[in-house]
Swiss-Prot record:
Protein name as catalogued: Succinate--CoA ligase [ADP-forming] subunit beta
Entry-linked InterPro entries: ATP-grasp, ATP-grasp_succ-CoA_synth-type, ATP_grasp_subdomain_1, Succ-CoA_synthase_bsu_CS, SUCC_ACL_C, Succ_CoA_ligase-like_bsu, Succinyl-CoA_synth-like
Protein residues bound to substrate: 244, 300-302
UniProt EC number: 6.2.1.5
Organism for this UniProt entry: Methanothermobacter thermautotrophicus (strain ATCC 29096 / DSM 1053 / JCM 10044 / NBRC 100330 / Delta H)
């Protein structure tokens, strides 16, 4: 479960991490009122769950008199394929220095990892590739307590001046405490701003493990929460893989991996209805990194004609045009293939050929 920035900052503040003053607006009038109350120039920040807002024009600055116009421009615009419905209006804080700090799960080491850098406000992946020595990495045994002196040691290894070590170390310690408390997969501050004597989380990211939501029922009341209906994992590639059954989906992913990179694992399960197919396609198409969708269905209790109708409806209402490669065989396959053929949607019956086609399309885009 990913949190909007304003929601993440509410949690960060509750755990003692300072954030800029501000409020959420859904209209230009609300933005104008918030800016007037702040009485200073403001940052207008699109509230979307995708990354890279700044580069995509989703963060702008305005005076109190100009905030309504800027907000109007951002609302209903799209940032990396996601529609902006709210903006966060925050005081524009003077920046002396930008740092980076995060807590994540290191799946290779099978333990939490603190990452910190004296260079904040940049893409951490780019920094890791360009200057890996500038990132401090500190693994934490999940059976041990993370003590304040350890957080201060991380701040010291960042190369900070001695007067900053207690305050920055304090933020690192608090960030890890909320990371553990809320069963997070990611808790990130980028940038962590030094502004005079203050240390402020200018941005906040929080992603909580979906399997832990039952322990945090307050999250079920939040707009970010979506009840889980698929076995879904977001990956780093550009080819979304959907299948009916974990084995079929993993097999399709293995074939994609021969020459390409999967963007998702999505198992719709057995007996998937027309509506489930439509929602599954809607979900993967909503991710901006997805350039091709590979749907692999071997009909058993899942009927090929239901799958075909779901595909037709999903493509008719899709928010963006993404190439779709379908492998469709099994129960009612003749009817399903007829529906696709009449809708002008190509399909394959060979799994290997379908996977090759998906990779080929992705490489030529």
């Amino acid at each position: 479960m990913k949190f909007y920035e304003y929601s993440a900052k509410e949690i960060f503040r509750a755990e003692g991490i300072s954030t800029p003053r501000g409020g959420v607006a859904e209209t230009p009038e609300e933005a104008e009122r918030i800016a007037a109350e702040l009485g200073c120039d403001v940052a207008v920040k699109s509230q979307v769950l995708t990354g890279g807002r700044g580069k995509a024009g989703g963060i702008r600055f305005a005076s109190p008199s100009g905030v309504a116009e800027v907000t109007g421009d951002l609302l209903s615009s799209e940032v990396r394929g996601e529609t902006v419905e709210k903006v966060l209006i925050e005081e524009k804080i003077p920046i002396d220095r930008e740092l980076y700090v995060s807590a994540v799960i290191d799946r290779t080491a099978k333990m939490p990892l603190i990452m910190a850098s004296a260079e904040g406000g940049v893409d951490i992946e780019e920094l890791a590739a360009r200057s890996p020595e500038k990132i401090v990495r500190y693994h934490i045994n999940p059976l041990d307590e993370f003590l304040p002196y350890e957080a201060r040691e991380i701040a010291r290894k960042m190369g900070l001046e001695s007067e900053l070590i207690p305050s920055v170390g304090g933020v690192i310690w608090k960030l890890y405490q909320l990371f553990r408390k809320y069963d997070a997969r990611l808790a990130e501050i980028n940038p962590l701003v030094i502004s005079g004597d203050s240390v402020i989380a200018a941005d906040a990211k929080l992603e909580v493990d979906d399997d832990s939501i039952y322990r945090h029922r307050e999250f079920m009341e939040m707009e970010e929460y979506e009840p889980e209906e698929f076995a879904f994992v977001k990956l780093d590639g550009d080819i979304a893989v959907i299948g009916n059954g974990a084995g079929l989906t993993l097999t399709a992913m293995d074939l994609i991996k021969l020459n390409g990179e999967p963007a998702t694992f999505l198992d719709i399960g057995g007996g998937a209805s027309e509506d489930v197919i439509r929602r599954a396609l809607d979900l993967v198409i909503s991710h901006p990194s997805v350039r091709v969708v590979f749907l692999n269905v071997l009909g058993g209790i899942t009927r090929a004609d239901d799958v075909a109708r779901g595909v037709v409806n999903a493509l008719r209402d899709a928010r963006r045009d993404v190439p779709l490669v379908i492998r469709l065989t099994g129960t009612n396959e003749e009817e399903g293939q007829r529906i696709l053929r009449e809708a002008g949607i190509p399909f394959e019956t060979s799994l290997e050929r379908a996977a090759e086609k998906a990779v080929e399309i992705a490489k030529n885009l």
